[in-house]
Amino acid sequence: MANTKKTTLDITGMTCAACSNRIEKKLNKLDDVNAQVNLTTEKATVEYNPDQHDVQEFINTIQHLGYGVTVETVELDITGMTCAACSSRIEKVLNKMNGVQNATVNLTTEQAKVDYYPEETDADKLVTRIQKLGYDASIKDNNKDQTSRKAEALQHKLIKLIISAVLSLPLLMLMFVHLFNMHIPALFTNPWFQFILATPVQFIIGWQFYVGAYKNLRNGGANMDVLVAVGTSAAYFYSIYEMVRWLNGSTTQPHLYFETSAVLLTLILFGKYLEARAKSQTTNALGELLSLQAKEARILKDGNEVMIPLNEVHVGDTLIVKPGEKIPVDGKIIKGMTAIDESMLTGESIPVEKNVDDTVIGSTMNKNGTITMTATKVGGDTALANIIKVVEEAQSSKAPIQRLADIISGYFVPIVVGIALLIFIVWITLVTPGTFEPALVASISVLVIACPCALGLATPTSIMVGTGRAAENGILFKGGEFVERTHQIDTIVLDKTGTITNGRPVVTDYHGDNQTLQLLATAEKDSEHPLAEAIVNYAKEKQLTLTETTTFKAVPGHGIEATIDHHHILVGNRKLMADNDISLPKHISDDLTHYERDGKTAMLIAVNYSLTGIIAVADTVKDHAKDAIKQLHDMGIEVAMLTGDNKNTAQAIAKQVGIDTVIADILPEEKAAQIAKLQQQGKKVAMVGDGVNDAPALVKADIGIAIGTGTEVAIEAADITILGGDLMLIPKAIYASKATIRNIRQNLFWAFGYNIAGIPIAALGLLAPWVAGAAMALSSVSVVTNALRLKKMRLEPRRKDA
């Protein structure tokens, strides 16, 4: 190969030599390609002719075989975007770059998230490409205070607005003269005076629009800057023409439009300032989450307590936390006991009792006891850091509903410029033949009333505020796509253990005296069985002292037999009692049947071959589970329960909480198949679970919802995470989705409707340019303001909420 290039790809998913050989063989089948795949290093080295192939082709080939290619992600801060046409153009250019898998640009956050193949491109190339388009870009610095940066930018906008307003105010008075036939000083009507006021507004304050327009046009694009620059320049330079004609001795009074250009720019700056101010409020939820983080920690070093910055804490460090202090990082208690306020995570205001070996979460509040803890997760690995990451990703993601707006934004400005030119021609040739001014005014009005900004802000602002509000309530959406899909859910499938129930057995019923309970708990105390643990905990709550077992024997399938302090103990089922000639009174037999019918595990207790008690143990239903399921039913959502338990136990739990559909006796690997069956019936299914065996079903469902008290595997597989395990958050999550999508539709209706109605009205000459400019400025503000209403959203579902 005369002209060759070489690239190296990191491959994931190879398990043996057959994998590497298969990939190598497939790549080498391509013309002018020489590939070597190394299983040990998990890399493919490819020599190729760049005139025939590119790296993306090799990546697609590898992925088509079922393997992955390592992708890196970078977040970029972008400044200089003024409307949806800007963000749409940057996104389109980035996605066309070699090595970029996917790029999304968010106008509201002024950030881009780019997934790329490091062998083909890098973050610096991405930044350079954006800068060539005329925007400022930099790699996001997570240590930099984004809030203060935005506050400075907002202050700069305000200063420019004030200067522009001061210069434009006298010119604005001229408009009122025309409208209300008012008398003003002659100075105000002097062309030189108007020129002196309008020029700095046009070319100093408004220079940003010229720069933006030039950079966009140079790169073959067009945005709002083009509309503003063309519209205001037309008014300004026509006024210059009239002024020169007047200076050359024209006898007719000059028709000046300096006030139009200056006031237009001022109103647009005013709208941009209000928009930026409103947009800054959309990230308040994230700011509040960040403010929850502890700032320092008390570490135990050589027996001394030392305060250190939080970022200096390492895994394994021993920390002291006193009452009233925040838990600095995630960890485990090794000494002491306390109550911890975990409301920032769960929304539950009642403090949770914590003892030795219990886990504690960073940034929760220690209420009433000094504890010593070992740090287990620090920095970006803590629970709060992961929550913040999920919220950030959700707020910067795009919902599918935004696609139409993005497509339109890409063509919007050129179409509007074309319409304005057409309107000018129609007016000067047909409406007012030979008269220049009405044609100019109508075309300027068309240019300045058109607003691609509102289209670009309609979806991301609602997603940002909606996901932020949900996060404040313990509901974490992993992206805008999942916000949109959730509102379509009509069926929810709940795993039983750990989701509907608490996931740990407790004693629900006991009939017998304290001596029997003491002997029973002593017999069970050395067992690791969950039922035994429940009995021992119950005895401890009764403050009974447990002794030692002399002999112990398990009777498989029936129970246990033990000797304690010369007492012979039998604990088990009917068969165990019958085998030992112990008869059951009718009321005990009836109680046993009743407990079993309710899905409880009931055990008979005999001391010295005499029946002395009966105890029932069950995994209890979570608080509010019944209320949550009722709310889902009220919303018109079908609820089903999926469990590996037997049908009797499952039916008993379902009856308690009001679930009609029960799918029982299901093996873990069959859960995903059950979800698929429901989907084949045309249902939109959400699966709610907390365990490792729920992960395949969570992935298969249209929406996977993980309970935050569950395993990391389940949470990773889910689209929504419910913090703390409160089932009431499930209907709230669905309502948050519905409210957010409803808000997006309102915004899109306004954004489309405004342009569809505004442009024809302006074309008919019914709007003065300054009125059109004010309408354009306020259209974006109205969209952002409507989105901000979600901040006050009460997550209380309505009956059959649409």
From Swiss-Prot:
Looking at the record's lineage, which domain of life comes first? Answer: Bacteria
Q: Where is the HMA domain?
A: 5-70, 72-138
Q: How does it sit in the membrane?
A: Multi-pass membrane protein
Q: Where in the cell is it found?
A: Cell membrane
Which amino acid positions bind Cu(+) 2, per UniProt? 83, 86
Residues engaged in binding Mg(2+) = 690, 694
Instruction: Name a single GO biological process.
Output: copper ion homeostasis
- Active site positions: 495 (4-aspartylphosphate intermediate)
Q: Family assignment?
A: Belongs to the cation transport ATPase (P-type) (TC 3.A.3) family. Type IB subfamily.
**Mind telling me what this protein is named?**
Copper-exporting P-type ATPase
Organism, scientific name: Staphylococcus aureus (strain N315)
